Amino acid sequence: MRGAHYVAIVLLVAAGGQTAAGFDQDEPQHAPDNGYMASVDLRNEFLQSRALQASRNPKDDLMFSAGDEERTPLARSNYLKKVTIPDSIINTANAMRMEGKQVRL
């Protein structure tokens, strides 16, 4: 049985090697017209440019340009939020999990 696993792994590695050898990386990457980058090397730069925020300088009220922006990490509150679930839903889920037996927490 071990021999079959080794043969299967060798075949998968060989097939992957042929697929990688057949992939031509010299083809030009065309960027779509909607502003998204197609090149893997530019992906980080693109994502960082989308996270720019306006300068906190009060003199820069209405003057926004690339020079007036600074890179800041997103606040945790924007993507981590505590979800409150009503007790009735929790009790119903516990009852379904326990096959109808009422369980109080």
From Swiss-Prot:
Belongs to the RxLR effector family. GO terms for cellular component: extracellular region; host cell cytoplasm; host cell nucleus. This is Secreted RxLR effector protein 158. Secreted effector that partially suppresses the host cell death induced by cell death-inducing proteins. A motif (RxLR-dEER) lies at residues 50-71. The keyword Signal applies. The RxLR-dEER motif acts to carry the protein into the host cell cytoplasm through binding to cell surface phosphatidylinositol-3-phosphate. Keywords: Host cytoplasm, Host nucleus, Secreted, Signal, Virulence. It comes from Plasmopara viticola (Downy mildew of grapevine). Its main location: secreted. Residues 1-22 form the signal peptide. It is found in: Secreted; Host nucleus; Host cytoplasm.
